[in-house]
Amino acid sequence: MNRPLRFIIATPICDGHDVAAAAITRILRGEGVEAVYIGFNKTAYQIAKAASEEDATAIAISTYNGGHMAFLKELVKALKQQALGNIPIFVGGGGTILEKEIRPLMKLGITKVYRPPLDLLDAVRDMIGIVNDHSFSQSSSQSFASQTLGQKLTSIGLSPKHSLHGDQWPDLPRVWGFGGRGGAGKSTLIDELVLRFLITTKGSIAVVSADPTLGDRLRMIHCYNPRVFMRSVRVGPGENTTEKLQSIISELTNHQFSLILVESVGLGQNELGVSSIVDASIFCMTPEYGTDIQLEKEALLATSEIVVMNKRDFPQSEARSRRVKQFIKPSQKFFLTEAKHFGDPGVNSLFDELATLSNLNTNSSLLPTSNFVEAIPFNRRNYLGEIVDVHQNYYASFENLAPEQLNDIQAEFKQIWDYYGFDGDMSNLRIENGIAFKQVDNTEIPIAKKTTTGIWVPTIGMPQKNASINEIVRYLSRQNIPGSFPYTEGAYLYRRKDQDPIRMFAGLGLPETTNYRFHLLAKGHGSPRLSTAFDSLTLYGLDSDEAGASAKVGEGGVAVDSIEDMLRLYDGFDLENTSVSLTMNGPAPTIMAMYLAAAKRKGFNWKKLRGTIQTDIFKELQAQNEAQFPLEPSLRLIADMIEYMMIAVPSWYPISISGYHIGEAGANPVQELAFTLANGLTYVEILKSRGLDVEEFTKKFSFFFTSGSELEFNVLGRVARRIWAVALREYYGVKGSGAALKFHSQTSGRSLQDTEPLHNLTRVALQAEHALHNNTNSLHTNSYKETYTTPEEDDVLLAMGSQQIPLVESGDFGYIENLNQGSYGLSYLEDAVESAVHRIFNEINMQGGVIPAIENEYFRTAIQEEVQKERKALRNGERKIIGLNYLPSNSSTRPRGELVQISTQDKKNQINRTKFFKQTNKEKAKASLKELQAVATSDGNVFEALIKTVEYATVGQITSALAEVWGKFRPSM
């Protein structure tokens, strides 16, 4: 019997670009291959361990953020250590893998490298063909006794006669089976039990997971410990779980495992799962089980030794648990748990019982404890649906206005016209330097400007003075002048002339290297606006000396491990007169604390510091994956930081709700807008429930959107401002500037093509125009080379030109502040996009809001569906990309220029500096980290404690210390 193909799919350490990896997994499954996706941010050791335990026939690696040469070398070495030196390894990474690197990679041991413009489906079919033709067979070429455990389990699955029932281990481990409906949280519960086993014992544990999609390993974040063995078993529709698992479990009992946990597939009501082939069973359920009659039908509920009701955060869980207890026997144990919460007391109690029944020698005093509070009260979970209702009521209120209301609106419009209206009459105007000023209430207002051809045009465009009342009502309710509610055309009345919207993204290698680039970009600009890109190690809360990660040091951004790195990074800048953007999310509070501590050392006044830091954890869980901790403590830390900075650093924006990375993950423009605004409104709910003043903290919000090529990007900023304004004023009662949404834009990285990259210059210029016409508050324009390298200095200056030429050379933005406002086409598109956003709000509301929707995989599912749709459109030619699938030149040559790479010596220097900092501050760091943990497990402000901790501890040390008391982020698919 031929074994089925089994692929391990992963992305390397500090690489969260999982869109392609997830797509490959889906395609492999569609082609009938067993695909085990183990996730993103995986070390070479973790990939090799998974490949060994799963007895994979091939490995597929998707790598997109550099460092692949060194990483793949480590992977080949790790595979040889696992006796997998012959396993086929396939690698893809867009333009980041260069053509000249293919031969060295294949010489290293990589089977094949895939590059654009090859379609993913073609690549997958090619991989399958290569593996089918491959003479390699890890299992069949060896005797059963000499095979690894992973290979033995494969052999047993193919020929059950190999199953050993020997008595060489008289004290057999206790085998526990876990059954229950799909979605009960069995995988998370098992993983948390594994953690407690590792903490309290010195033994080893095996986990067997039966699943049609082989997807459970993704959530098992503790399975990579050397004392854990995990095997996934595919049980398809109609297949017998017991037959598939019996011989495998029997074989595992012949190895020195102290405990074996077996997860069954999701069960129907009359099914007993694996209960007949294990020593004892645990039935997992949730409070959402239906009626009591349903309980009587649950076969495993009546026969299991332990009953677990997971998802205790369900509002009726206590009442529901009392009902369930009436249906179980006195001999059955019952536990109410919340497995997703690190240190959950219910899971601790469950583990104690399981350990006792399994005769494990444990130390319960070492069990983690926590007491997380829900970020949003249950009675507030309909906020998005209520906001949609508020929007609809707002527009409906203008449909049947009373005469006195119409008179008020007419008077309001007349006042606006008297201030800013221009009808061509130049009398009574003062003219200076091509600007006509009107005297109103002792104030001179610039109402017209003279073009290069001598035509006078209004500074603010608006309806004619004698416009109909219907036109005026629509104008004031949906548009209005820039800087006035509902802020459709802009958060401010005028574009700033003393400060261009340029905020170029820079970061590379060592802090001093990036510092040099900053000074280059700031040259000629009176008030510099710096945007800082960090390397992937920093983004994942790791240090440059992290084991197995040297390839990532300084790649794609600057390496910042300590406060000393932060001092080097901004050396020579007057931070009180510099606006600094920090592109950081997971470890954002740590980086922000380092920035403040460094500024304090330099003598800068915190109250004069200006800038933005992203801090948005929602989009990490929805799209980008740079998260370190579970959601609840992450939100607590963010709220601590916002609360602290509102007072201590009042001119700083402590959170930038980001849609850009959602778009980069594959969301369409409407999804990006809707998800981002929903996230922003969720932060409002979180901070409001904390007792903070909505009027004040919303002033500190900023947003970050893509500016792409699709039609909807013509109005994305306009619609964002309008939806936000109506929600904030009409629903939350905000009267001040918090209702005026401010946002940064970046041209679409996803739209850039590695094939014929010079076309990217045109793409970026088009997208810059979209952003500027949306009146973005700041803008980063990508370099045309960014699909395959970090931009050189000339590339950055060229990218800056794509926004400077429209601003300086064209007249689009120098005369009329709202040039396109009132266009019939744009107005229709605005309304259509707004309605589409409302529909998505309602979908999220049906999930219970953003947080439950994250847990239910709503966002990732929606994004992946969009990715599949786009991939299909590109494949069949429905969507045309110049140079890729339409009008290709068939030239593979790239523009000349050196590829920007970080020298090995620079990486070594950074690693050595970090090690020296740690050694120098060893004792002080130990004490400060202990104090930080004490605050993190109490009610204190963790961010305030961080500001002290960063004086002596590194980013990685802080991440590890908080993970010990808060737990680690658990991905899902």
Sequence positions of predicted segments:
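Flexible beta-alpha connector loops of hexameric P-loop NTPases
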Residues: A35-G39, S62-Y64, R227-E243, T286-Y289, ...
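Conserved C-terminal guanine-recognition region of P-loop GTPase G domains, centered on the G4
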Residues: I221, L267-Q332
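Flexible, glycine-rich loop/tail regions that form catalytic "lids" or insertion modules at the edges
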Residues: S52, Q138, L360-L539, Q803-Q804, ...
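Extreme N-terminal, non-catalytic leader segments
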Residues: L121-V175
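Cofactor-cradling patches in redox/metallo enzymes
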Residues: C14-G16, A21-A123
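Canonical P-loop GTPase G-domain recognition
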Residues: P104-D126, A302-N361
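Nucleotide-state-sensitive switch-loop elements of NTP-binding domains
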Residues: L158, H162-P173, G179-A184, T188-N270, ...
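Catalytic alpha/beta active-site cores
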Residues: N65-G67, D441-G708, E712-F713, Y731, ...
